[in-house]
Amino acid sequence: SGLFGRYHGDYHFENILMTNRNKNFLLLDWRQDFEGSISIGDIYYDLAKLLHGMIVSHPQVNLNRYKIKNLSGKTYINIFIPENLKKCRIYFYKWLKKNNLSQYKVDILTSLIFLNIAALHHTPYNKFLFNLGKIMLQNSIENKEFYF
């Protein structure tokens, strides 16, 4: 079950700006609707999109700082995650817990986002995203921690 409320739809760091003058946040590139509604959507989806950006940073992808290898029938993946995003994810999980939000739901949706967007990207990045989504989904279902 979702948590419905005002939502963004493409909530990741590249779509969040902070003004210098009064430190307000501006959100860019709002999704036009969620299943036909322009006023409400699933907040868990926005939280999952934010977590997606903490794990896979577009600047790191643009610098080719991710890897995928197949050895003896097993797939291994890795991506460089800047220290600030690692800390951000720790605070994010604490914030979820403090606000009685489900980390499990956020992790499941994040893994589904990776699986869903994989087909939209070039090789080998698409294979990296697919395997990341698959590994994260399996770990989430089995209640295992997911580390990078």
Q: Predicted segment positions?
A:
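Hydrophobic, Leu/Ile/Phe/Ala-enriched alpha-helical segments that form helix-helix packing faces
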Residues: 54, 58, 92-100, 137-144
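Active-site activation/catalytic loop segments of kinase-like enzymes and analogous catalytic loops
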Residues: 24, 33-94, 111-125
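Intrinsically disordered or highly flexible coil/loop and linker segments, enriched in small
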Residues: 16-17, 60, 146
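Regulatory N- and C-terminal appendages and interdomain linkers associated
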Residues: 22-25, 101-148
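Acidic, serine/threonine- and proline-rich low-complexity regulatory regions
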Residues: 36, 96-105
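Active-site acidic catalytic loop and adjacent metal/ATP-binding pocket
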Residues: 1-41
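Short, surface-exposed alpha-helical recognition segments that flank or form part
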Residues: 2, 80-83, 106
